[in-house]
């Protein structure tokens, strides 16, 4: 299309071919958010983070990433809608040739903004829900108006020709109503539905005892989802259901981000560049886009090279015949659960720390924590956590 600028520079190809291109750029525009979901993946101390990047600084990030081969950009947060320059950022990403995603709670979205984003060239909008039940949704979101606003905006997104992509984070307090969740999605004429069981990073890790479903809950929920899949397929229905399980019930770890610094690059609101959105908590000095080019960050910085390849691996990963499949699992999870990011992901049954995972499974069977007892993601709690750390 004539309104898209071609990538004028040939992508830099590193001397070590095992380093992939940063194809997927996650632009965390802000940590500000009107909601306070207790499973948010943002850092616990988000309230103390530095000043947000300016419009021009984000333009530079996108330009440099595109020149390196980045193809897709996700605008996320916090809530990206609080940025007044969001339409400008979308338009620039479109001009550069990115496929553009907006990942939003829908709070703050209006029909006028949807039209403006469409004109700017936005390709895709994903709206998240907390539950199919208004009371539970609003309790988890920390807003009495959240559910009604989400419904209204989901319908508006559909009216304006976007594929309707809905995301439900499931956990022990809503997973038993997964049939109601799917029915709501069908009523909204969703094209894609991600039923993503809570992943335990950030605030979700803090609240794990009150969020991790039991194994029986997961088995039932997946069975219900499969029944709906079969029915939809028989009816030739276009809606696709994606069921994401927590790796706490697996015996082998996920190949997190397809390998550290291999395909995925996050830039946080203050410009810190990360190989995944959870890596900020590690005791590693990650580079900042204010100080370094994206090329230096991706290929030369210590933070992005720390866990590339296999030479860093201790046992049991070093001699494992599965290391090329899972890269030792998730470095952030290894750090959170064992205190050392170089350890094998405790999800793996070969890990010396696998007992941490089996203990969490056992605890889920007797957990009694209510929604009201969860630590909600808000400025007050974040400041308290930052002060005590």
Swiss-Prot record:
GO annotation, biological process: pyrroloquinoline quinone biosynthetic process
Domain named Radical SAM core is located at 19-234
Residues bound to [4Fe-4S] cluster are 33, 37, 40
- Membrane spanning residue stretches: none
> A Pfam family this protein belongs to?
Fer4_12
What is said about its interaction partners and assembly?
Answer: Interacts with PqqD. The interaction is necessary for activity of PqqE.
The UniProt function text for this chain reads: Catalyzes the cross-linking of a glutamate residue and a tyrosine residue in the PqqA protein as part of the biosynthesis of pyrroloquinoline quinone (PQQ).
- Descriptive protein name: PqqA peptide cyclase
Q: Which organism is it from?
A: Pseudomonas syringae pv. syringae (strain B728a)
């Amino acid at each position: 299309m004539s309104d898209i600028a071609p990538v004028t520079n040939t992508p830099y190809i590193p001397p070590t071919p095992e380093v992939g291109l940063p194809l997927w750029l996650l632009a965390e525009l802000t940590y500000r958010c009107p909601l306070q979901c207790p499973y948010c993946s943002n850092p616990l101390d988000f309230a103390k983070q530095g000043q947000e990047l300016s419009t021009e600084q984000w333009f530079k990030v996108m330009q440099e990433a595109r020149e390196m081969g980045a193809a897709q950009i996700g605008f996320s947060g916090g809530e990206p809608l609080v940025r007044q320059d969001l339409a400008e950022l979308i338009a620039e990403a479109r001009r550069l040739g990115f496929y553009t995603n907006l990942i939003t709670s829908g709070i703050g979205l209006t029909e006028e903004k949807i039209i403006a984003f469409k004109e700017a060239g936005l390709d895709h909008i994903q709206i998240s829900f907390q539950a199919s039940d208004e009371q539970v949704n609003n309790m988890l979101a920390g807003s009495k108006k959240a559910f009604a606003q989400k419904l209204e905006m989901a319908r508006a997104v559909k009216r304006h020709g976007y594929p309707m992509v809905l995301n439900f984070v499931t956990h022990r307090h809503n997973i038993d109503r997964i049939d109601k969740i799917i029915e709501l999605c069908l009523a909204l004429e969703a094209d894609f539905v991600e039923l993503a069981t809570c992943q335990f990073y950030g605030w979700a890790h803090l609240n794990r005892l009150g969020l991790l479903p039991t194994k029986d809950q997961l088995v039932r929920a997946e069975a219900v989802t499969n029944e709906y899949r079969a029915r939809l397929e028989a009816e030739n229905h276009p809606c696709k259901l994606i069921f994401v399980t927590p790796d706490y019930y697996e015996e082998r770890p996920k190949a997190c981000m397809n390998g550290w610094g291999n395909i995925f690059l996050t830039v946080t609101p203050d410009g810190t560049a990360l190989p995944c959105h959870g890596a900020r908590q590690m005791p590693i000095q990650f580079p900042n886009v204010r100080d370094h080019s994206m090329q230096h960050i991706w290929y030369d910085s210590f933070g992005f090279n720390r866990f590339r390849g296999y030479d860093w691996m201790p046992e049991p990963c070093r001699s494992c015949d599965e290391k090329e499949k899972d890269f030792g699992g998730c470095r952030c999870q290894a750090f959170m659960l064992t205190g050392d990011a170089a350890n094998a992901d405790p999800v793996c049954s070969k890990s010396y720390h696998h007992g941490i995972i089996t203990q969490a499974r056992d605890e889920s069977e007797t957990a009694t924590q209510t929604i009201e007892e969860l630590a909600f993601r808000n400025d007050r709690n974040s400041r308290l956590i930052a002060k005590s750390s």
